[in-house]
Amino acid sequence: KEGIIMAVANTLRQVRTERNICQEDLAIAIGSCGRTIGRIERSERSASLELALRLSKYLDVAVEELFVLDEEK
C-alpha cells in the first residue's frame, strides 16, 4: 500500500507542477483544501475515490495515469 500512495503522490505533484497550478488553487477548483492536496503529495494520506475522480477531471488526466501502481517498489 505504501508504494501505491507514493506513486500517486509523485504523479499528482508532477502533473500539478507541469501545469503551474499551486496546491491551493487546485484544492479550490476541486472543492477541497490545500492541506489535503499537500498531505496526498507528501504521502501522508490517500485520496478517496471521489477526490481521485475530481482530480482526474480537473487535471484532464485519466484516473489510470494519475494513480500509477509501481509494482517494482
Give residue spans per PLM region:
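A short, Lys/Arg-rich alpha-helix, primarily the initiator
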Residues: K1-E18
